[in-house]
């Protein structure tokens, strides 16, 4: 029996769903379940997987919910560690963030966006010879605890990344996506640039979809940002990510990046 916990925002949820899907294949579609951690998805608006993608999520059986409660109690008491340790192949409860490229190798096969009835910028992005997404994440990353652990990417990082892109693709046009677009407009002086602002309110995954339409990507230290590039329909002709993924020096960057991506 394997139980994969769904938690965090959409970026993390995608890693976790891919882990679940891989385990299903490994175990011949038997004995693998999802647990929806409402407490740890609530602050991100809940579970977004089936709203953003053509996914049918399974119902969580009551016995799985009870099993998770029991396993979490054992974890608090430090008992039967093999049942929940992240590095133990015998673990039943998989409650890490599953961020490794081995778990997402088949992501393109299982993750297809739900169509949007109407969405600004689609034609503008797809008509460009070389559209580049630039994702600036601030928002919750500015909270003291998150800033200490994650940090925010510097203006220098974005400007340097833009120079790197233009050296290879002089015709690049940059499309800036951000949860703080006013800050981006005031601080990012990028050439040939469009700041993405929707005429009507759109869910966050609208930006994820638009980012995936681009041929190049400059991402933030964010799993949401990562997926915008990884699911790129332009096959990511160039993708740049921050070498320092975390502000906390003892945390290592996750092994999720394709070899041809550039660390800066």
What are these regions (language model features)?
Residues 10, 163-250, 256:
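Donor-binding and catalytic core of enzymes assembling or modifying cell-surface/extracellular glycoconjugates
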Residues 1-3:
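Extreme N-terminal starter segment of soluble prokaryotic enzymes
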Residues 5-15:
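A short, glycine/small-residue-rich beta-strand->loop->alpha-helix junction that serves as a flexible
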Residues 29-41:
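A short beta-strand-loop structural module common to alpha/beta enzyme folds
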Residues 48-57, 189-198, 252-264:
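Active-site regions of enzymes building and remodeling cell-envelope glycoconjugates
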Residues 15-23:
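Short amphipathic alpha-helix
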Residues 40-164, 168-169:
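Secretory-pathway luminal glycosyltransferase catalytic domains
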Residues 22-28, 168:
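A short, Lys/Arg-enriched amphipathic alpha-helix followed by its capping loop at the start of a domain
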């Amino acid at each position: 029996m394997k139980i994969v916990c769904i938690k965090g925002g959409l970026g993390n949820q995608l890693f976790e769903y891919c882990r679940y899907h891989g385990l299903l294949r490994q175990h011949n579609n038997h004995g693998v379940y999802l647990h929806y951690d409402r407490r740890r998805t609530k602050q991100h608006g809940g579970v977004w997987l089936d709203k953003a993608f053509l996914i049918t999520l399974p119902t969580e059986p009551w016995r799985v919910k009870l099993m998770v409660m029991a396993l979490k109690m054992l974890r608090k008491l430090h008992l039967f560690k093999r049942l929940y340790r992240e590095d133990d192949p015998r673990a039943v409860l998989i409650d890490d963030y599953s961020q490794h490229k081995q778990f997402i190798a088949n992501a393109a096969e299982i993750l297809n966006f739900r169509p949007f009835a109407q969405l600004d910028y689609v034609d503008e992005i797809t008509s460009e010879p070389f559209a580049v997404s630039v994702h600036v994440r601030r928002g919750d990353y500015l909270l003291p605890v998150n800033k200490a652990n994650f940090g925010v990417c510097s203006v220098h990082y974005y400007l340097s990344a833009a120079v790197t892109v233009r050296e290879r693709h002089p015709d690049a046009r940059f499309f800036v996506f951000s949860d703080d677009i006013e800050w981006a407009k005031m601080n990012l002086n990028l050439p040939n640039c469009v700041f993405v602002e929707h005429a009507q309110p759109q869910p966050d995954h609208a930006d994820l979809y638009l980012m995936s339409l681009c041929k190049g990507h400059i991402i933030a230290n964010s799993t949401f940002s990562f997926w915008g590039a990884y699911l790129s329909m332009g096959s990511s002709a160039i993708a740049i990510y921050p070498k320092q993924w975390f502000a906390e020096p003892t945390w290592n960057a996750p092994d999720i990046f394709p070899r041809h991506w550039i660390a800066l």
